[in-house]
Amino acid sequence: MEQSEILRYQPAEKTNPYPAVAWTLLLAVLLSGGALLAMEHLWATEVLPLMRVFAIAIVTVVCCAAGKCNRRLSFLWIVPLLFVFITTGFRGCPSGGMAWINDMLSRWNSLHEDGLALFSCNASLRDRAAFASLMAVLTGLLAWQIAAGRRLYCGSAFCLFWLILSLLGGGFFPPAFVLLLTSVFGMMLSDHAQGISGRGMVWCGGIAIVLCLC
């Protein structure tokens, strides 16, 4: 009598998700940092310390990463948004946004001797700071979605948007686009699980160095 074979199934080896999440977090920080650098150079005056704007965006990205690692913390992405709404009241954000657009239009008019109409607004420094804080949170959220989903077309369009805006507004700042392009190249070198090999990291670092030297 033949003995039936006993098939033993071994569970699939679990992979550590944290390196992939850390890499995604880095890409999102680079992407949001480049966008915020570009935005900061389009203001006529400094409205918030740059490190504070970066800190808001980084905290936002970290909250998104925490939600990715633990589903119970998936609500954390809304915490920075609520914090900005509570501290600013949201009342100054529209005026601050119009003031930011006015700064770009004024620079365009002075560079090209044009007469583009400006928005009628009387924004205070607090209104501008409120808008900058809101933009830091929204930029962090968008950068995380682009990096986590490996959305290369969206990332490229994101970079192109800030490039066109900077050129039209007369506030082109090369380091901002080094960060933006490094993030996009990092997404290109990542696999579908958002991980990256040691060779890919070397390539990404080399590309960043070349962009810095250009």
Residue spans of the language-model regions?
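Helix-boundary/low-complexity linker signature
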Residues: 1-214
